[in-house]
Amino acid sequence: MPMDKSQKGPGGLTEEERDEILKDIRERFTLKLDHSAICTKNIDELTYVFLRALTGGDIKYRAPDVAGDDPEARSSMKTVAIQLGKEDEAEAAYMAPVEGIDGEVQSQVNHFIEHTGECFQHIALRIEGDSIEEYRELTEKLGVNYITPLLYDDSSNLLQMFTGSLFRSSNPAAGPFIEINQRLDLSEEDRQHFHHETVQGLYSSIEKLQERDEQTWIVDFDKIPEDWDVFEDDTTYDD
């Protein structure tokens, strides 16, 4: 039985109103996999899997201690960025294994593993098409909750933002999250997706979010219509 589209869902929209916004999004934006961060207890093992078993990819970024000499850092992590695909592919996706380094406080990576297990900490989707500001405005109308403002990184020419937790976790501050980003330059001259300042700043931002322990999900799951069934959904968006 089809869902009653006059009822309201996340964002306070009727499902009919939601259809109109979703059609607009599909016409104006494309989302592609940019990278994914994977929390692990052993970065050597996981990196070996990607480099020596699955892809033979290239490491484009290494950080044995993201915090480095930062005197204000209370914890840290190790990470590498592995490019998937050929050397000359500007739009290649990346896998980024991360291993926590505890300090004054537990590393956010180990905090995540404690609550969720070893798995994806966030998946980054890259926007192509119109501006990320317009995408955020439209998705917020649909009920998407973002836990960061729109962040700009001038070293990577990157705009990015993070959603609330992807699942009904008992501890949403632990994640996992979705990152939405827009790379303003994927030219032949600038293909570097990972800069140390970007990674360091992002780690600090997520650590502060976890310390606040705000219970934020990506959408209010309780407001999803009870009669919505993925196997009954017949929504199509004609061009």
Regions found by a protein language model. Name each.
Residues 1-61, 71-239:
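Glyoxalase I/VOC metalloenzyme domain signal
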Residues 65-67:
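Compact beta-rich and alpha/beta scaffold cores in large eukaryotic transport/transcription complexes
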